[in-house]
């Protein structure tokens, strides 16, 4: 009560942000008459004027009112649209590096032009991030008219572009692109070997459209570039055949946390089947069967937790994941740790190889690279705490241009799903009777097709929009507001196209008049469409506007709000209602058994619903609990990813320094001296007597790393010799050998060799380190049983592993340079031979790839001492890369087999 009183007197936090901005809106409005009088050329000249003022020391904020007035006038002349005052407010909030929450239909796409133009004046580049290629292309063409009119360059990044096209797009003042493409370009850039090959410029300012979808829903899924490992497809198929034999008593399932485990009885059953199939000796949990346990667990998850047409669909011999928030197909995204391969085995499609990570980053860490970040969406307030804590972004609610006149009805709760769907069909029939359009939101393909079948039986014409048919999605959504139209859609999040009452003129013009080339005929037909849409719009308004029906509550209130927000745009009438049953996932998982008994006691008959505001409140509390749990999961994942992120920044910074350096000989010499110092310290401990020195081991180390056979044992017998003297002698011999090798070639060739090798070995070491980090992460949670904090344990061990990687890197670089034999007849030949080989068949995915032993060898394009490896001649095996399979045929890595010696 006191809170409400205080808000009435002092205003909300939101009001306090917007109040000082209103005087800037007045300033923009005051400039409008003068700017209307400017010619096109005079308006365009404003860009050069603003840039000159910035160079002379004027702050961006001081240019805001004039820049916004310029964009408003340019939009009127190019698009025929004028920014409303509330849109100016939204643009100012975005310029400040905050999130603008603007309701659906309030023109977010147009709002972005204001801060984009202002920040693009610095010529450092502005990125506008969208959720799919269609929206990136559409917005770059549509809003690009405004920027180009004002003399700015506009680029777009979409899938399938080559590096040159990407460089040109990123060099533009304004660049549109999807979150996936921008993130992958960052990773690919940090796998390049020359600065001029990199496509992105230093980060400056980004505006993220549908910011909640990208920074919250997709935050858990890392972007990964990976390379293939060995083929385990037969084992997946063999284990998969055992799963249908399991009965309910063989496993326990927890749907809240999406986990399934074998019971003792199930373990015995599986062991028996594995022995019969001759896949196992001993018991399932013997140390030698670790890989088998992994395959059994993933097959169990694939069969008992994942449902076809709900979690994934099968299309073109592939298992494609369906995004639980948007209902879209996630092409190229794969489940981690062998789960995707287990699903492929379950569905009988081609099993793709597991992969090893070459580079990865989460969206959380990618977008935190921008010095200035802003976002816009229709629904962010429910996640305001997360935006503030993780991204340091404040959410500001922008008032609507016209008051919302949508009626949000209380939820109707039925006992069974059958009754619920029958009630939805009845409501659709009623709406069609008065020609009111209906949009039904479902949570899965399966449910959308079930409802579609029910409507077909009633002979009710309708459109279905789900992951299967997403090619036509923009047109289907645009036409969802026609009189009597019925549209069924899996989660409406991120669809990006307005539902306009009566129909969408732009979309109909594009689809229906594509073949009409005669200008006069085209104008005539467009006028006809306009008149038809206006008549339809009036009919729909009279029938009550768009009726949005939710077929169940999502676990996130935000997704429900997004569905509701499709109705009642720009002051249009509309209505919304959610239909629920006790068989819905949210109700079933969060304690519906008690509720079922209660409803029976109340005498609820078949087909009757219970409707009460208290039920809405109870459901909202259940959703808040799920949201809080999901936030904790994301926050915890970020803490773990931050450990790798700090290391990634160090490695990527070092790579960039190496690429920009012409000469790395100083680093090479420092590496060599540090390696010798560490060798001597290991074999000749401080303050140890001469008879305690391990000179034999030191001799072996020097021979292995430097290919130098030195009389170290003889030196050790000399009277009064100290460890420093031995160290100096080894250093002297190693330096002389390196100098002799440099003298054989031109200085430029040797510099090229050193730089190329250093970059390639750094990449190989980083790749192996990522694999070790992943293995560490998978088992670290078990430390909690020993009363240790898994996060602190992970931080400590990851830091030690990183330090060890850097030590190993010095030794590997030193050793390769000492052993390598260079055979070049010309500098051109040297350049070709030193051109690093790109990893073959890399894959870009939106999930952690599965890991298994094995991997590709170091990508050296240099002739080493024994380059030809003969499997029948152990004398040639020394040339085998450390991570390649051992030539003996054991299946182990070379470094763990014959290379260990």
Swiss-Prot record:
Alphabetical UniProt keywords: ATP-binding, Cell inner membrane, Cell membrane, Cytoplasm, Membrane, Metal-binding, Nucleotide-binding, Protein transport, Translocase, Translocation, Transport, Zinc
Domain of life: Bacteria
CDD domains tied to this protein: DEXDc_SecA (cd17928), SF2_C_secA (cd18803)
Positions contributing to ATP binding: 87, 105-109, 498
Disulfide bonds: none
Single Gene Ontology BP annotation: protein transport by the Sec complex
Official protein name in the record: Protein translocase subunit SecA
Source species: Paramagnetospirillum magneticum (strain ATCC 700264 / AMB-1) (Magnetospirillum magneticum)
Phylogenetic classification of the source organism: Bacteria, Pseudomonadati, Pseudomonadota, Alphaproteobacteria, Rhodospirillales
């Amino acid at each position: 009560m006191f809170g409400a009183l205080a808000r009435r007197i002092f205003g909300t936090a939101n009001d306090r942000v917007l109040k000082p901005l209103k005087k800037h809106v007045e300033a923009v409005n005051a400039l409008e008459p003068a700017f209307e009088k400017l010619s096109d050329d005079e308006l365009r000249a404003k860009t050069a004027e603003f840039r000159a003022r910035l160079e002379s020391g004027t702050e961006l904020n001081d240019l805001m009112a004039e820049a916004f007035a310029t964009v408003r006038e340019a939009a009127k002349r190019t698009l025929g649209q004028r920014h409303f005052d509330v849109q100016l407010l939204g643009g100012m909030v975005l310029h400040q590096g905050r999130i603008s929450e603007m309701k659906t239909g309030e023109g977010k796409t147009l709002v972005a032009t204001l801060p984009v133009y202002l920040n693009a004046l610095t010529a450092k580049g502005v990125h506008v991030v969208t959720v799919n290629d269609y929206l990136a292309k559409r917005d770059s063409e549509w809003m690009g008219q405004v920027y180009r009119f004002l003399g700015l360059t506009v680029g777009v990044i979409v899938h399938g572009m080559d590096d040159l096209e990407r460089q040109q797009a990123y060099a533009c003042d304004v660049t549109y692109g999807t979150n996936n493409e921008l993130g992958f370009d960052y990773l690919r850039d940090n796998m390049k070997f020359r600065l001029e090959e990199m496509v992105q410029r230093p980060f400056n300012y980004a505006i993220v459209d549908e910011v909640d979808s990208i920074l919250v829903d997709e935050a858990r899924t890392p972007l990964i570039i990976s390379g293939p490992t060995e083929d385990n497809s037969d084992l997946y198929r063999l284990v998969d055949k055992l799963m249908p034999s399991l009965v309910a008593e063989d496993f326990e399932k927890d749907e809240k946390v999406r986990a399934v485990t074998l019971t003792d009885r199930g373990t015995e059953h599986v062991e028996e089947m594995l022995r019969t199939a001759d896949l196992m000796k001993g018991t399932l949990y013997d140390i030698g069967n670790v890989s088998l346990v992994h395959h059994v667990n993933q097959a169990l998850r694939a069969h008992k937790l994942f449902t076809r047409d709900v979690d994934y669909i099968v299309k073109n011999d592939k298992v494609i994941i369906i995004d639980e928030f948007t209902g879209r197909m996630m092409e190229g995204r794969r489940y981690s740790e062998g789960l995707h391969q287990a699903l492929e085995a379950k569905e009988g499609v081609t099993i793709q190889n597991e992969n090893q990570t070459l580079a990865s980053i989460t969206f959380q860490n990618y977008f935190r690279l921008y010095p200035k970040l802003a976002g816009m969406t229709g629904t962010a307030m429910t996640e305001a705490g997360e935006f503030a804590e993780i991204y340091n972004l404040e959410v500001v609610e922008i008032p609507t241009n016209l008051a919302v006149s949508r009626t949000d009805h209380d939820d109707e709760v039925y006992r069974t799903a059958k009754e619920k769907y029958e009630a939805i069909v009845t409501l659709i029939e009623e709406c069609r009777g008065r020609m009111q359009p209906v949009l039904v939101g479902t949570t899965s393909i399966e449910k959308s097709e079930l409802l579609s079948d029910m409507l077909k039986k009633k002979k009710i014409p309708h459109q279905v929009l789900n992951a299967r048919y997403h090619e036509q999605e923009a047109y289907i959504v645009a036409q969802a507001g026609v009189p009597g139209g019925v549209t069924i859609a899996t989660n409406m999040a991120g669809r990006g196209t307005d539902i306009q009452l009566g129909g969408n003129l732009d979309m109909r013009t594009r689809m229906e008049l594509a073949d009409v080339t005669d200008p006069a005929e085209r104008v005539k037909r467009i006028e006809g469409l306009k008149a038809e849409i206006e008549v339809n719009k009036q009919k729909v308004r009279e029938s009550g506007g768009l009726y949005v029906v939710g077929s169940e509550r999502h676990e996130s209130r935000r997704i429900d709000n997004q569905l509701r927000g499709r109705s009642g745009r720009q002051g249009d009438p509309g209505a919304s209602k959610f239909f629920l049953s006790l068989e819905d996932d949210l109700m079933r998982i969060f304690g519906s058994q008690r509720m079922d008994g209660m409803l029976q006691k109340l005498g609820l008959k078949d087909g009757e619903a219970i409707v009460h505001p208290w039920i809405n409140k109870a459901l909202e509390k259940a959703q808040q609990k799920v949201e809080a749990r999901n936030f904790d999961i994301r926050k915890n994942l970020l803490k773990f990813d931050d450990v790798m992120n700090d290391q990634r920044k160090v490695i990527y910074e070092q790579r960039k320094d190496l690429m920009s350096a012409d000469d790395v000989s100083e680093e090479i010499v420092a590496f060599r001296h540090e390696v010798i110092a560490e060798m001597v310290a290991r074999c000749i401990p401080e303050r140890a007597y001469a008879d305690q020195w391990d000179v034999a081991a030191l001799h072996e180390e020097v021979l292995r790393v430097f290919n130098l056979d030195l009389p170290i044992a003889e030196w050790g017998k000399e009277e009064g010799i100290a460890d420093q003297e031995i160290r100096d002698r080894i250093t002297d011999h190693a330096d002389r050998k390196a100098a002799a090798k440099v003298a054989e070639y031109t200085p430029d060739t040797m510099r090229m060799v050193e730089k190329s090798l250093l970059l390639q070995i750094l990449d190989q070491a980083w790749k192996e380190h990522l694999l070790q980090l992943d293995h560490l992460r998978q088992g670290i949670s078990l430390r909690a049983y020993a009363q240790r904090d898994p996060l602190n344990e992970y931080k400590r061990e990851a830091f030690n592993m990183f330090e060890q990687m850097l030590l190993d890197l010095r030794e590997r670089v030193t050793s390769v340079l000492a052993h390598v034999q260079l055979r070049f007849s010309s500098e051109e030949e040297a350049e070709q031979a030193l051109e690093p080989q790109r990893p073959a068949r890399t894959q870009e995915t939106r999930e952690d790839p599965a890991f298994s032993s094995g991997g590709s060898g170091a990508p050296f394009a240099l002739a080493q001492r024994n380059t030809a490896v003969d499997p029948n001649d152990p004398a040639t095996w020394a040339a085998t890369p450390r991570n390649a399979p051992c030539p003996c045929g054991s299946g182990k890595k070379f470094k763990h087999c014959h290379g260990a010696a």
